[in-house]
């Protein structure tokens, strides 16, 4: 069974280690579930959790991690990986995620000699994930991948662990993923994207949206609720918020159905 496989994988990974692993927890359901599973496995010890903060991390993700750390008695390290000062990251190339994860894992390795775990899952292997290359270089382990567990099983496991509605938490990559490839990533831009998405969620509770900063427009994409349910009155309110936050005019704002990875643009050479 998946749960037993995961337990065996973790036991093998920590065998003969002098320290418990540090789990890199972004605030998404994958890394949260891994951390809760491991904390249940080592109930008599505080597990080590690292959470990176910065302009690319939504504030709600950080708040979520802090609450869970208190609930499950994690030894939480809030770290600033400072990738926003890395010119390679700022340039926003197609492999931007590599530089983000490189900064993350180097920061974690600076304060622990123990193993580092990530919440990457089996489904991630079918997508372009340069962050996995950075993980490999830093000798980071991925228990879910080793146990052959994908997102669907993770959600089931989260439910079994008593995480309730969190088991249905929508996927939400970092805010930098909203910026079209090649457009420089800045603190101000990421803060505005976060502010815009939070404003929409205030108008539409539980909305699953992406505000993508594209070369020629701001693309507001709806996964939930569906775009055809957004009436003109609501669009007008959202447009007004966008004009105020980004200092743009309404002709550069579009409403679209969510499309995964639509801000990621491969170069013509590729």
Located regions from the model:
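A sequence-level detector of short, solvent-exposed, charge-rich linear segments
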Residues: 132-136, 177, 194, 198, ...
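A short interface-forming secondary-structure element
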Residues: 215-234
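A residue-level signal for beta-strand positions that form part of recognition/binding surfaces
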Residues: 137, 172, 252
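ATP-dependent adenylation/nucleotidyltransferase module used to activate substrates
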Residues: 1-160, 218, 233-249, 257-270
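A short, flexible beta-alpha/helix-coil linker loop
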Residues: 84, 180-182, 225-227
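Conserved active-site loop/cleft motifs that coordinate metal ions or position small ligands
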Residues: 210-212, 219-221, 253-256
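Mid-to-C-terminal catalytic subdomains of enzymes
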Residues: 145-210, 257
């Amino acid at each position: 069974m998946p749960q037993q496989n995961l337990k065996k994988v973790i036991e093998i990974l920590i065998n003969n280690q002098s320290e418990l692993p540090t789990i890199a927890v972004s605030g998404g359901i994958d890394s949260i579930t891994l951390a809760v599973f491991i904390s249940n496995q080592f109930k008599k010890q505080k597990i080590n959790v690292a959470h990176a903060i910065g302009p690319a991390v939504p504030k709600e993700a950080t708040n979520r991690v802090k609450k869970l750390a208190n609930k499950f008695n994690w030894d939480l390290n809030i770290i600033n990986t400072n990738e926003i000062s890395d010119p390679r990251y700022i340039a926003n190339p197609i492999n931007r995620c590599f530089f983000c994860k490189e900064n993350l894992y180097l920061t974690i390795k600076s304060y622990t000699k123990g193993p580092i775990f990530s919440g990457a899952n089996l489904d991630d292997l079918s997508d372009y994930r340069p962050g996995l290359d950075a993980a490999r270089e830093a000798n980071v382990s991925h228990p879910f991948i080793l146990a052959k567990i994908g997102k669907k099983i993770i959600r089931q496991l989260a439910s079994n662990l008593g995480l309730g509605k969190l088991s249905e938490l929508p996927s939400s990559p970092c805010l930098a993923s909203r910026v079209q490839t090649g457009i420089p990533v800045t603190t101000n831009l990421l803060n505005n994207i976060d502010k815009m998405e939070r404003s929409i969620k205030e108008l539409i509770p539980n909305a699953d949206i992406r505000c993508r900063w594209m070369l020629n427009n701001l693309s507001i994409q709806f996964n939930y609720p569906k775009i055809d349910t957004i009436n003109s009155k609501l669009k007008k309110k959202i447009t007004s918020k966008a004009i105020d936050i980004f200092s743009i005019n309404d002709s550069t704002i579009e409403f679209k159905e969510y499309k995964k990875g639509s801000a990621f643009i491969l170069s013509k050479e590729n």
